Structure formats: C-alpha cells, structure tokens
C-alpha cells in the first residue's frame, strides 16, 4: 500500500479551491453541509421549581431535536495526491471533504462524539465532488451566541510519499496496531489523524484516529460503510 503523508502549516495564502486542513469547506452550492440530528431531554419543572411527575411518580420530560454540525477536518484536491497514489485507489480529479464528530478530542464540549471503535455511522462523512465548479466559496457557519465562525484557521496541506504504516497525518495508511487491524480486516485508513498540541488535538494520553474504508469501496467511491478506530497507548 502506498501511504501519502500529510504536512500542515499556517498560511496567509488564499486556499479557496485548494487542499487545506481546518478552515471552512469550499462546498458547491448544491452540496449541503453535514449535520447530525440531536435529541435533548429536558425535565419539566412546575411552578414550585420541582420536577413534574406523572401519576406513578416518574419525572416528565420534553424532547427537543436540533441539528448539530460535524467538524470539518480537511478538503483534499485530488490532483495534489494523484501522483502519489500508485495503486489508483483515489479519484484523479475533484475534491474530497472530510467531516467527523471530533470536538471532544479538540477539548470542546459537544453533544455528538465519534465512536471509539466500529461503524462510524453518521458521525463521519466523506463527500466527494468530481466536477468542482470554478465559483467555490467557503461555507459560512457561525456560533449563534457570539456570531463568530465555528471554523478554525485554515492551514495549507502538502503531501509526500510515506511508509505503509504512517506516524503522521496520512491518507491510505495501514494501521500497524493489532487492536486496530484485528477487528477491521481488509480495511485501510482513508485518513489518519495524529495528535497535535497546536490544535489541542489529543486522543487521551497518546493516540491516533483512523477513518477506515475497504479499498473496493474506495474504488467505487462508496463512503457509506466507513469505520473508525481511536487507538490509545
């Protein structure tokens, strides 16, 4: 397997339509930003300030459902990585966008969290756009209470050839830990994330996050069966 190492660096350069880590995704207008629906249960309180109960003494709740955005990780311009993909697993053109519920590992509160092991479900989204329009614009998303952008400052991405088992951010790596490979035979890491103190990105004491996919699914551009593994030492 030909692993592709990823290096990121702060920049003042315009990254619209380019590969970049963090920042805002340049999604085409017809591609919606991925959200997860969250249901909150709130205890009903009476005029006396005490929880309201039914005839059997059970507390009464009301449910509120709202959308929670996934964290944007990066977008990869396929032309940047195609020369390094010797096995032809990745598309040759277009843009690939990565989103996941990783706020917890960035030291932030969030009602959603990526699974530690197994099927990623709706907590990971990979969006591939083959024909990218010329008029891309960064997606606009702000916190309701402050009006500030939810996105971190964007960093430029550079790519290079790497060993099969990467020790850095990477694409197409093969996890070397038995705890990751044994429950996921035949999977590779479409994206591997390592800890970075600059972003307060930590996987407990020390670890890695693997967003896993079968090579055949990747060739078919099928991202519905992604798995994830948070490995910690």
Where are these regions (language model features)?
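Preference for intrinsically disordered or flexible, low-complexity segments
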Residues: 1-233
């Amino acid at each position: 397997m030909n692993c592709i190492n990823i290096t990121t660096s702060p920049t003042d350069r315009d990254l619209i339509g380019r590969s970049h880590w963090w920042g805002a995704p340049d999604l085409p207008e017809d591609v919606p930003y991925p959200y997860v629906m969250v249901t909150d249960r709130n205890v009903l309180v009476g005029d006396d300030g005490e929880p309201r109960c039914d005839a059997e003494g059970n507390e009464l709740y009301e449910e509120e459902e709202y959308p929670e955005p996934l964290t944007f990780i990066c977008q990869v311009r396929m032309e940047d990585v195609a020369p390094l993909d010797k096995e032809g697993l990745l598309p040759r053109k277009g843009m690939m966008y990565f989103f996941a519920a990783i706020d917890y590992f960035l030291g932030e509160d969030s009602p959603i969290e990526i699974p530690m092991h197994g099927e990623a479900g709706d907590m990971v989204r990979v969006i591939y756009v083959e024909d990218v329009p010329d008029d891309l614009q960064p997606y606009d998303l702000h916190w309701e209470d402050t009006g500030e952008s939810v996105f971190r400052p964007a960093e430029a991405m550079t790519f290079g050839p790497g060993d099969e088992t990467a020790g850095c951010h990477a694409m197409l790596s093969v996890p070397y830990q038995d705890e990751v490979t044994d429950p996921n035979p035949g999977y590779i890491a479409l994206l591997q994330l390592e800890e970075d103190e600059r972003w307060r990105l930590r996987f407990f004491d020390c670890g890695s996050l693997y967003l896993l996919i079968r090579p055949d699914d990747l060739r078919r551009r099928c991202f519905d069966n992604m798995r994830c593994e948070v490995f910690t030492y």
